[in-house]
Amino acid sequence: MGQKVHPNGIRLGITKPWISTWYADKSDYANNLNSDWEVRQYLTEKLKAASVSKIVIERPAKSIRVTIHTARPGIVIGKKGEDVEVLRAYVSKITGTTAQINIAEIRKPELDAKLVADSIAQQLERRVMFRRAMKRAVQNAMRIGAQGIKVQVSGRLGGAEIARAEWYREGRVPLHTLRADIDYSTAESHTQYGVIGIKVWIFKGEVLDGLVPAIEEPKQQPKRKPRGK
């Protein structure tokens, strides 16, 4: 049975950047990795209502810089920057170094796979029909400018006794093309019937780095001479 490779993992270092960018000696590597995990767990839990897509961590010169990509920067910053200062102090406490927190606003949340998956999960928890939630997400993404989107939900859909998976796709979603800019994410929806898993693939176009795609002209077939001449 054919399985699909993780769309982000196969493109890592080609068209997808790492979400942690730092170098450490062998003695410090495990501590840095563990503190990265703790920072992400804390921020994800603390900023549940802030529509956080991803958290990028950098470690320049014995300090840590955390960039929070969110669709609702006002919730992260808080009144007069009080909330972000609390986050900065706690991140500094976890890592034991000076911390800096930057906030990047996501202008088009309909084209962010993580935010789309979280939105569908929240709708399912509010007992919205899963087909309606899927179709709404697909229509919004295509309307904003996606070249293709695929949404899959799996579990006890509609409270059915037997779990199953259903998916809906519109446009192109080329999984094997490495230059394709595909945003992929997952989410879980905890309903009264059990956990429903959500997967979202969004195709935003091809990453060509300024190259113009070559368009091959169809070759003209040589004319055949009629027989008998």
From Swiss-Prot:
One of its GO terms (biological process) is translation. One of its GO terms (molecular function) is structural constituent of ribosome. SMART domains: KH. GO terms for cellular component: cytosolic small ribosomal subunit. Belongs to the universal ribosomal protein uS3 family. PANTHER family: 30S/40S RIBOSOMAL PROTEIN S3 (PTHR11760), SMALL RIBOSOMAL SUBUNIT PROTEIN US3C (PTHR11760:SF19). This is Small ribosomal subunit protein uS3. The gene is rpsC.
